[in-house]
Amino acid sequence: KNDSFNRYISKEKNIQFLVNQGQLHWDKRVNIKDANLAKLFLSKANNLNPDNQEIVELYARACHFVGYYIESNPDRSDSLFIEGMNATWSFIISTNEFQEGAALFEGDSTEKNIAGIANVSEEIVPILYWWVSNYSRFLAKKPVMDRLQSRDLIETVLHRILSLKPDFFYHGANRLFGGIYARLPGVELSLSMNNFDKAILGSPNYLGTYVVRAEY
């Protein structure tokens, strides 16, 4: 019993060390080396404890940050976005709320996923946000058909965020809707602009929305 307890304590200390190092480097992420080290430490912490929401959230955010702002190689950026997607999605589908929602719906896997997302609680909004942030960045330069196939699930996640916590990350769901709709064929550009406007109205001092809008 003592050996098992000691191993548990050792693992917990190791996780806490990795998280502390990840947070330390994340706080200095304006430096490229620190941003990459933050992602590295947080990935190791997440591997040891994939059920810790705070670790998953910061890890996925670091994946998005390095993939979007730092990495210049498209394939490596995609790998980072996929890392963030996988970590957050694994967490989402493990929640009781998701599983209960999915279990009540008889249909294919996509429909079950949509039903599960529609049932999740406000507590995991940050996880939803960093999942969809990584996924939408991954899809941004993919063929139109790939983006259309993912549309229903992505829209469900964004609508769930808007219904639970619309101001999360400087009205991030509206900002993401703006970018996604700007790239989808058959969608009125005004729908994209309306979402960018809502994000700016809600968080006028967040420059990221202006930057994303300028891309389109």
Label for each model-derived stretch:
Residues K33, A102, E188-L189, Y210:
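Secondary-structure transition/capping residues
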Residues K1-D167, G202:
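N-terminal alpha-helical interaction modules that lie
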Residues F41, V157-R160, L176-F177, Y181, ...:
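Short, hydrophobic/aromatic alpha-helical segments in well-folded domains
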Residues N36, I82, D197, R213-E215:
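Amphipathic, non-transmembrane alpha-helical secondary structure
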Residues P166-S203:
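Alpha-helical adaptor scaffolds
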Residues E57-L58, Y129, G172-L176, L207-R213:
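Alpha-solenoid helical repeat scaffolds
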Residues N195, S203-G208, E215-Y216:
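Outer membrane beta-barrel transmembrane domains
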Residues R61-A62, S133, R175-A182, E215:
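Contiguous, well-ordered alpha-helical segments that form the cores/surfaces of helical PPI scaffolds
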